[in-house]
């Protein structure tokens, strides 16, 4: 069984390993404390000698004089205590050099260990110290005043401390009493100098403040403080960039098609463009209509919706389009109501918004009337009663409404001969509605239902589709694979249309057409009918009397037929259940023009020298995409869920991390697996090659980073070591430019640094890493990017982050379906950004292509891939006017023409 523990690998063994590791860390801490105490005693003796000299009339060094730190003292003058890998503030206070009140970048000096006000925690969840005295020269130990009795009692007193914290408290007290140095300075005067924002907010807050001495910035996520040290080259935060970046994004291409779980999703417009939808975007694709796409095709996008589009209908004029969206919530948790947009496909301008506040959950099906040039629109929502309503298209006024059925409604349509006849079908039913209104007065229409009777024929579980024939009969396709012909009775056929008696339809013929359900029916211009099967994946053309004329089979890897649309001449467009859009005919077969994933996406990486990128996700497919040709280069079945990937700097191989702890190295040309390794049994969340290609880092949910040395352009690897110290699963990591160090984030908001070349050692003094340069910046926590976090963040609001290769902008993927663009570095709280909509689910990843010409973003549940063109300084083409920090795109600003 997967994940079963072998001998000696059970929970007891893991617990023993954890305890042993903790013991080793504590022993190291004791050595550090002993060394610090010895150095403190030596400095006290030096201080005593200085006092003696002063008493003898010899002048001692002043505060402004230059005194070097004794060689035994570390540059930061303070050991960092690290327990179980979590980050703990220094027990000895850091005091920088004197300077302007902005920032000071000299190395910190030692001070007595004062305590912060109640409620302030260190980065790892323990109490932290914070200096309150005036600044002094770097590296100088200065005495502090004894603690006054009137001060606030200790935060970690024995009465309120947990057993695990007491040894550390005793250790600190012992150090203070032995050296008489670590005295608490908690006077009212010193506390008055603290920033009032230094206390953390409540759960789910994101508050930040600057250390008064200018060494660090602290922000809070879920009440936990995260300390980030300011690089020495930054003298003042005021010199950092402010405002949104000059670069902007323009949606270039959308990969994918929503065929897995939707219907009424594929049509051909009068212009020849194919219209379909995915996520919140309605795509207008022109086969062969322009440079760049498969067969020279191009895309335009209607982006007026605020949540996922569920259905489409095309007006009889072939220009106007109606699209219905589902309900959702915005970033503040407020509900977004389902609505129908009627828009012009030539200008992409919204003409009418219908039903705001009238529908529940979402819009399930739409249809324009045909007999009166599309004057009316019928809508079925996704409420429990599946309300059927009729609307005046030009005025957006509801004319009639009625409860349809408690069962699912999958299709709706007007009779092309008579707008008073409406048909709905779905779970175990087909209903024929007579609309007695039609004068256009609001609410004057009545809808009367007559249920279809199956009689001697077996009643199917579902009737997913139907089509009207030129003679007025109706064909329905059902879950049994049958096509039923419904004809009107003789008396009703003589009845004039509007205002006459109810029309009665009965089954007059049945033909077994497919094995399994029939998902789509399409009436062709020559009067023949096409049917698309689910299980058998067959397309069949039917003549009069339901005689089969011709058929073709869709390849299995494309899935079953979901929708059929007739193109130019004999050309057909077919949408499939595996989110592919095929183009061809029954004689020559079909080839894909649009392809996509079918389940949640997480893994994304871009090629180091080409405009190509690779994706993987829960559908177990690994796909390499050509960003220039907007096409799928190749795909393969991983057999397991892929969660992360990265190209070797040579581009010859790519590594893919799976949800079982396995990782694969594949040749990008042959797709051959050249390496198959397993590290632990937890999922892998990040894989990253060093910039020189000599190391590979694997971040796992078992809290460890596995390091491998790499040779032969990535085809060979061997275990080099493990980075152990995080207290939660690894979420992000980056390599330094020299390939020797790693910065990593974890699930409990840690920022740790590792010396890989030195033996995968944890760098306990994080202050020393403040000036290190990073080859990539994908960690979501760090000084250079902390400004991207919104107020009130709970720590999960940002899923992915990527700095451009030119180090000018940062792209952010958030949990509210948005892609943001910030200036880099982004080290100001509440930094403004350019915000872009389109995804219908949390955005899981963003990456820039090798030359920063494109940005690729992944949707989670919507399985969409967006390719954005980066415009701005130095790029061709006008930059679209996108407001910064727009709460939601207005219809005008959301159109990408």
Swiss-Prot record:
Chain positions found as N-acetylmethionine: 1
Composition skew (Polar residues), residue ranges: 51-68, 175-190, 883-897
Residue stretches of each WD repeat: 235-287, 296-345, 351-393, 399-435, 449-488, 505-544, 550-585, 590-627, 630-668, 675-710, 717-756, 766-824, 831-870
Keyword vocabulary terms for this entry: Acetylation, Cell cycle, Cell division, Coiled coil, Cytoplasm, Cytoskeleton, Microtubule, Mitosis, Nucleus, Phosphoprotein, Repeat, WD repeat
InterPro entries linked to this entry: Beta-prop_EML-like_2nd, Beta-prop_EML_1st, HELP, Quinoprotein_ADH-like_sf, WD40/YVTN_repeat-like_dom_sf, WD40_repeat_dom_sf, WD40_rpt, WD_repeat_EMAP
Ranges of Low complexity composition bias in the record: 96-108, 118-132, 155-164
UniProt keyword Transferase, yes or no: no
Compartment(s) where it occurs, according to its Swiss-Prot or TrEMBL record: Cytoplasm, Cytoskeleton; Cytoplasm; Nucleus; Midbody
Family statement: Belongs to the WD repeat EMAP family.
SUBUNIT field: Homotrimer; self-association is mediated by the N-terminal coiled coil. Interacts with EML2 but not with EML1. Interacts (phosphorylated at Thr-882) with TUBG1, HAUS1, HAUS2, HAUS3, HAUS4, HAUS5, HAUS6, HAUS7 and HAUS8.
Function of the protein: Regulates mitotic spindle assembly, microtubule (MT)-kinetochore attachment and chromosome separation via recruitment of HAUS augmin-like complex and TUBG1 to the existing MTs and promoting MT-based MT nucleation. Required for proper alignnment of chromosomes during metaphase.
Protein name per UniProt: Echinoderm microtubule-associated protein-like 3
Gene that this polypeptide is encoded by: Eml3
